[in-house]
Amino acid sequence: MQHKLLINGELVSGEGEKQPVYNPATGDVLLEIAEASAEQVDAAVRAADAAFAEWGQTTPKARAECLLKLADVIEENGQVFAELESRNCGKPLHSAFNDEIPAIVDVFRFFAGAARCLNGLAAGEYLEGHTSMIRRDPLGVVASIAPWNYPLMMAAWKLAPALAAGNCVVLKPSEITPLTALKLAELAKDIFPAGVINVLFGRGKTVGDPLTGHPKVRMVSLTGSIATGEHIISHTAPSIKRTHMELGGKAPVIVFDDADIEAVVEGVRTFGYYNAGQDCTAACRIYAQKGIYDTLVEKLGAAVATLKSGAPDDDSTELGPLSSLAHLERVSKAVEEAKATGHIKVITGGEKRKGNGYYYAPTLLAGALQDDAIVQKEVFGPVVSVTLFDNEEQVVNWANDSQYGLASSVWTKDVGRAHRVSARLQYGCTWVNTHFMLVSEMPHGGQKLSGYGKDMSLYGLEDYTVVRHVMVKH
């Protein structure tokens, strides 16, 4: 397995402390990787800064060609990437290969095209004898911090728009799941000029802090927890860096009496538990109107009970393990606290799976109340709660009564209600009669403590640029 860092176009061993990388399906150590030293972090940033002098001036066509080559290489090595992701994250191999790899390839291809469509505005004469123009230029060095739930996909979401806009990147994947990012570094080094892409390994304190706080880093992009986002915003404040934050969610799933219950059950069974629920848009906070509450709980409980967790290389496996032992304990604690309320009922699941690996049973909890922690706090595991509501006004207020604002869905056959409710929801995305669907052309991002900035789409590309005014006297 490729375990070296990419700094200034060269694969080099880390000079810092070694950290174990685990297989969450077994709990075994896959390998140990040495972290980047402080000197290597500095070298990576300075290499990116030096490379920016030329990369930032390349044509969109030239940048697009590099991105397309990288997309092709990822596609050609799709099985290798899927196997690494499966071993390091515990994802079902078939899901990694069939779902994630094509989406990752598409992100690079989309931004290759988008790079050639990014324009400033040719304005007019707002002052006599002077012509004004608006430019969208790259910022410089971007420090990108990727999470452990979708390591390669989140690396793609960060690398593609930043590079397409003409920036240079220093990427730090999670120390829990670094293997696909390190493999990507190996394949990218011969496609991009030295220093344009740099990939480091290490923990937040030892590598993340010196990276994000480096004076030559002009922007920090994070997908992670609220706590990590708060830390980075505070840490980077003295140098006034631009920050781009995607900090998780607790998606409300609003099911009205007239909804297609079978579609809801099928949707939540899939979209509430995909990736073992380790998804910031997971359909995890159901609000069911009183007329269909009992029916939905009964049918959804039966459906969730059929979900199969097992070995990642088994084609019949639907849920793999959680990503780490520490996270397994967090999920278990959240469910135990829900049980202890006395009014929340475990419909199915609610316990760790016996044996090796970090497995937690697919869990459905009914009878949850609006103020319960299981409703208000992100669990980030295969755990879905159901809360009864009376009317539209109540459920909109409850759905918005959350520190999160990333994703939501509304299930109803009433078109007017669908438009009315979706317009009032304080979330970056609202799906109607579906959930979880993402495409490269549409923006993904939140509000409130879910963060700000957009991934994917032309809006995502613009986030990695600075708007400049040029005035010419004539």
Curated annotation (Swiss-Prot):
NAD(+) binds at A146, P147, W148, K172, P173, S174, E175, D209, S225, I226, A227, T228, C280. SUPFAM superfamilies: ALDH-like. It comes from the Bacteria. GO terms for biological process: L-lysine catabolic process; putrescine catabolic process. The active site is at E246, C280. Keywords: NAD, Oxidoreductase. GO terms for molecular function: aminobutyraldehyde dehydrogenase (NAD+) activity; NAD binding. InterPro entries: Ald_DH/histidinol_DH (IPR016161), Ald_DH_C (IPR016163), Ald_DH_CS_GLU (IPR029510), Ald_DH_N (IPR016162), Aldehyde_DH_dom (IPR015590), Aminobutyraldehyde_DH (IPR015657), PatD (IPR017749). Its EC number is 1.2.1.19, 1.2.1.-. Pathway: Amine and polyamine degradation; putrescine degradation; 4-aminobutanoate from 4-aminobutanal: step 1/1; Amino-acid degradation. It catalyses: 4-aminobutanal + NAD(+) + H2O = 4-aminobutanoate + NADH + 2 H(+); 5-aminopentanal + NAD(+) + H2O = 5-aminopentanoate + NADH + 2 H(+). Pfam families: Aldedh (PF00171). PANTHER family: ALDEHYDE DEHYDROGENASE-RELATED (PTHR11699). Belongs to the aldehyde dehydrogenase family. Gamma-aminobutyraldehyde dehydrogenase subfamily. NCBIfam families: ABALDH (TIGR03374), PRK13473.1 (NF010000). HAMAP family: Aldedh_Prr (MF_01275). 4-aminobutanal can spontaneously cyclize to 1-pyrroline, and 5-aminopentanal to 1-piperideine. Homotetramer. Catalyzes the oxidation 4-aminobutanal (gamma-aminobutyraldehyde) to 4-aminobutanoate (gamma-aminobutyrate or GABA). This is the second step in one of two pathways for putrescine degradation, where putrescine is converted into 4-aminobutanoate via 4-aminobutanal. Also functions as a 5-aminopentanal dehydrogenase in a a L-lysine degradation pathway to succinate that proceeds via cadaverine, glutarate and L-2-hydroxyglutarate. This is Gamma-aminobutyraldehyde dehydrogenase. It comes from Escherichia coli (strain SMS-3-5 / SECEC).
